[in-house]
Amino acid sequence: MKSLMQAKPFILLFLLTCSKLLSNSPQLGVPPEFKDGPEIIISDWHIGTTMWQLAVLKSIGMPVEAYSLSGHRRYALDNPSFHENPLFVNLGSWSEEKVREEFAKNNRYSRLTHVLCSFPPSYITAFEKLPPQVALLLNIGHRIHISASPNDFTQRLVEMKRNPRYTIAAMSEYDFHYMHYYTGLEPLRLPVISQHISQKLRDAPYAPCNRVVLVGPSHNTTRIIGFDNNLEYLNRLSATFAARYGLKPYTFKFIKSLYRNDQATMENLAKHPAVLINPYSAFSISMVELYHLNIPFFVPDDSLLINTMDDVRLYPIYQNREAVAHLEMQYPVSTSGYPYSPNDESTEAQRYWMQFMFFNQVKHAQRWTDPDDLFRKLYLHDLCQLHDDMQAENAELFNEQLKVWAALFGRDKKIENISEQ
């Protein structure tokens, strides 16, 4: 075989050109603007809170990486902004000395200025082990007392609010008021905007491909409020109402049963004419995503939700009665500025705190009081107009919040809308 030096001149020129191009190209799989490492890292235990905030930060031009600890990490396997590193996996258990030693070894973190954490809120304290020049942003995703000693973390949050290293925000109106009740302090409002949903889907006209109404949110597999949790009964009443008006009936199906094995993609969900929401918490990412897809959104009236939502108070899921009683004694309602505690189980307290829940904060959630009311609004109202109204509402929210995020990181002039994440 001839040696390289014996090859024809044009081959040598070709090889030299390729070598120069490769040496000047960015790292494989790393966007050119991010090749020198992130300025902000997102890391917590909830894939939903990570995905929407990652998309927002990318939209304003922030070099960002995500290190998810969630069991649902599989939802982001094809997202090159998600990374793995033992430092973030072991952050909670390693000593501060070990964390800073490992941090210093990684040149990719030399530009890091911020870490963002949302769930559970108390996990933000683990990031205090990072060098002190790294600022910490907590955007509370679900109540501050989840996975924490209620009394201890309440006081810790007050201390954080006074510490310039911290920025404390809330991604729901409920969490804003929950924190205000227990601390007397007001976090920054950074509500969920589902920027990870493509611009194409968010701008799409109302064009359902079927007559299947989704029963959600996505994690709901059994609950149908107002219909005794009986899907067959719901579909029978729907067919009867449709026949009365000579209309083709809608069929209701749970999202999880319709789309198994993680097939409930945004594209698939957007094909449906409407969604029947059965709230189990004050807000959930999957609930917000459905609204931000502009799918006509039907929710039981507040009167039907009394004693049906099991994930709005600390007891019994997150704390025992004794722990909650002690918390209420330490932070009595009389000093809170509110008429009721968010952990009060009374009917009056439940009604009061419902005003801060997601479905009562948006403009176009369709509330219904009984089956006939639901079917009248579903069959006889203009769902296309409802979709368009939701679309306008959501577009305004997204535009406003992108500006807030840009200002927070000094990126006011660099907002860019990206159509695909």
Where are these regions (language model features)?
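Structural motif
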Residues: 42-48, 68-71, 92-94, 115-122, ...
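Catalytic core of nucleotide-activated saccharide and alditol-phosphate transferases
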Residues: 118-210, 216-221, 336, 346
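Catalytic binding pocket for nucleotide-activated donors in carbohydrate/polymer assembly enzymes
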Residues: 279-280, 284-396
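C-terminal alpha-helical cap of glycosyltransferases
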Residues: 376-384, 394-421
